[in-house]
Amino acid sequence: MITKEEAQKIAKLARLKFEEDTVEKFFTQLSTIMDMIDILNEIDCKDIEPLTSVCNMNARMREDAVTSSDLSSELLDNVSGNSAQLAKEVKYFITPKVVE
């Protein structure tokens, strides 16, 4: 069980801000989560072997191969409009401002 002060500290560390009416809901939900974690911590798992795969299949591995991964020219070929040439010269996309 955690206290309201601990819940408020956790919210502050996570940079969460709550209105007065939602603080109680946050505290209740966080307290429930912590209680569930406590229940899981009480389970004795020392005689249980770890599960590595649900369907017990082996992954087919491939050899690593060094390849060229510079796709910038191919991506910039898709730029259209007035900024296409400039985008190819500076090698980045030019977009309208979306955040003010």
UniProtKB/Swiss-Prot annotation:
Domain of life: Bacteria
Alphabetical keyword list: ATP-binding, Ligase, Nucleotide-binding, Protein biosynthesis
A molecular function GO annotation: asparaginyl-tRNA synthase (glutamine-hydrolyzing) activity
Presence of the UniProt keyword NAD in the record: no
Reactions catalysed, as given in the entry: L-glutamyl-tRNA(Gln) + L-glutamine + ATP + H2O = L-glutaminyl-tRNA(Gln) + L-glutamate + ADP + phosphate + H(+); L-aspartyl-tRNA(Asn) + L-glutamine + ATP + H2O = L-asparaginyl-tRNA(Asn) + L-glutamate + ADP + phosphate + 2 H(+)
InterPro entries reported for this sequence: Asp/Glu-ADT_sf_sub_c, GatC
UniProt key word Lipid biosynthesis: no
EC number, UniProt record: 6.3.5.-
GO biological process: glutaminyl-tRNAGln biosynthesis via transamidation; regulation of translational fidelity; translation
Record's function text: Allows the formation of correctly charged Asn-tRNA(Asn) or Gln-tRNA(Gln) through the transamidation of misacylated Asp-tRNA(Asn) or Glu-tRNA(Gln) in organisms which lack either or both of asparaginyl-tRNA or glutaminyl-tRNA synthetases. The reaction takes place in the presence of glutamine and ATP through an activated phospho-Asp-tRNA(Asn) or phospho-Glu-tRNA(Gln).
Family: Belongs to the GatC family.
Oligomer status and interactors: Heterotrimer of A, B and C subunits.
NCBIfam families: gatC
Protein name: Glutamyl-tRNA(Gln) amidotransferase subunit C
